[in-house]
Each structure stands twice: as structure tokens, then as C-alpha cells.
Regions:
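Cross-family detector of peptidyl-prolyl cis-trans isomerase
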Residues: 2-178
Length: 178
């Protein structure tokens, strides 16, 4: 064939050129980064560049949407849906242990107005039933606990998938320490 393209060669070129925009779009998508302790995060909305950035010791107000990584992404808490327009943000001090450690790690470096999606592994996710945030609705709270702390599934080695959670965090306000 030396230097000429047959029908298959031309078809391959057409196929690749048609696919190029899809690859370019894929390359433009933000990639998750390791935020520490295995927490993966991606900024969906970067936040106001002139706004305060959250750091350890700051009090923050956040809106959350939490779902299980397993169980078809079952949503166990959604501040937007539950508030029906009257949203009450969660407030906690970063590093105080008031919320699961993965959520504290996930908010560090965010700026007010930003939205970040974080995938939180079991080691820094829910360890017991005293940790916040928990669903405001009793039935969702019970379902979360019976999924994450299910003794049969934990004995079967399913703990890593059951207690991995995904949160969308909207940083509403940073209250800088003293």
C-alpha cells in the first residue's frame, strides 16, 4: 500500500477527527485532587477570589448535600431540598472534631461562594453515631446508620464501600478566628 490510504484508513481519520472535540471537552473538565487523608475533591464553583479562604481554626457556615458512594448514590441529606428555600447552614469550627474529619479536610482552602465535591473514605468518614452532620429527618438518619454500621455487611468486608460518602459543600461564610 506504500503511502496511500485505503477505505479503512480514511474511515479511521474521520472517526478520530470526529472524536477530537469529545477528548478536548474531557481534558477541560476539572480533575479531583487529593486534599489529604485520602479525601478527593474537585471545585465545581471556585468561589469569590477576593473572599476569605477557610483554614484550620476558622468557623465556617456551609450548605451540604450528602450521599453514599455505594447504594446508587442515595442522598441522605440535602440542605436545599429539606429547607424548601429556608436554608439553615451548618456551622462548625474547622479542626474541632464537631463534624466528620473528611468534611473538615474538604472545606480547607475553599473560598466563600465556592462549591466543592468531596469523596470521603471510611477512615475519615462516620466512625460512630455521634458525628455530625446527620440527616435532619429521622428515617434518613436511621437508614444512614443501618447502612454504614451494618454488622453483617461489615463482617463481609463491605465497610470500605458502605462508609465512603460524597458531599457537595457550598461555603457560605468564613468567620475568621479572633
Amino acid at each position: 500500500m506504500g503511502g496511500t490510504l485505503g477505505r479503512r484508513g480514511i474511515g479511521g481519520v474521520v472517526l478520530l477527527s470526529a472524536a477530537a472535540p469529545a477528548f478536548a471537552e474531557e481534558a477541560a473538565r476539572p480533575r479531583p485532587v487529593d486534599l489529604g487523608s485520602g479525601v478527593q475533591g474537585v471545585d465545581l464553583i471556585p468561589g469569590n477570589p477576593s473572599a476569605s479562604e477557610a483554614s484550620e481554626g476558622d468557623a465556617v457556615r456551609v450548605l451540604l448535600k450528602g450521599r453514599l458512594f455505594a447504594k446508587q448514590g442515595w442522598v441522605f441529606t440535602d440542605d436545599y431540598k429539606e429547607g424548601a428555600g429556608l436554608v439553615s447552614p451548618h456551622e462548625y469550627v474547622v479542626g474541632s472534631g464537631e463534624v466528620i474529619r473528611g468534611l473538615e479536610i474538604g472545606v480547607v482552602g475553599m473560598r466563600e461562594g465556592g462549591v466543592r465535591r468531596v469523596v470521603i473514605p471510611p477512615a475519615v468518614s462516620y466512625q460512630d453515631k455521634t458525628q455530625e452532620p446527620v440527616p435532619r429527618d429521622f428515617s434518613n438518619r436511621q437508614r444512614l446508620y443501618t447502612t454504614i454500621f451494618n454488622p453483617t455487611r461489615l463482617a463481609n468486608g463491605e465497610g470500605d464501600t458502605l462508609s465512603t460518602v460524597v458531599f457537595d459543600i457550598e461555603l457560605v461564610r468564613v468567620l475568621k478566628r479572633g
